[in-house]
UniProtKB/Swiss-Prot annotation:
Protein name from the UniProt record: Glycerol-3-phosphate acyltransferase
Pathway it works in: Lipid metabolism; phospholipid metabolism
Topology in the lipid bilayer: Multi-pass membrane protein
Organism: Koribacter versatilis (strain Ellin345)
GO biological process: phospholipid biosynthetic process
Amino acid sequence: MKTFVPIALLAYLCGSIPFGFILVKLFLKADVRQTGSGNIGATNVARTGAKGLAVLTLLLDAVKGWVAVFAATIFIARVSNPANVDVRLIPAFAGLCAILGHLYPVWLKFKGGKGVATALGVFLALAPTPIGIVLGLFALVVLLTHYISLGSILAAAAFPFVVYFLYRNQYPAATYAIMGASSLLIIWRHRSNIQRLIAGTENRFPASKPTEGKA
């Protein structure tokens, strides 16, 4: 427990840095939460018209997820079997905490983004090869349907299965459970998108006119 608490706290705080909010406030003197869906992620930052800031938000949100996992990996490399647990759990646990930080940032009254970019960084740090496959799936879905939300949902759902298929017994069962929980969180945060996909009212990409409540 003494091992997991500081890792959880640091990873959460790293993930909770609201780069989209900060960049829009800094460069546009505006509150991105007052635009489009009110989300702080890259998709909503793009709705401000600042495409460069949207790309930077995407990159920084991914980097913070990667950093959380990398820092946990460095930690277990320097400590001999901390807390007598399987050390392979710790990077995945840190990644989950970073995603939670992005979804529920303490700085913004626990109202954050949908976690796709942060999860990308986390998953890239945990298992780079599966990320290539999952990104291919995302790109294919968006290319065929023009729904970014659908691509994100399916990519998140596929990741733990792709990891298991490629690595089988290289990770303990708890690690796959943590990866699965991370994916479920992302899908849960897209529940309004799922409702619009079912209703046929979800915006396509590129959309000619943003719709309130979009991801």
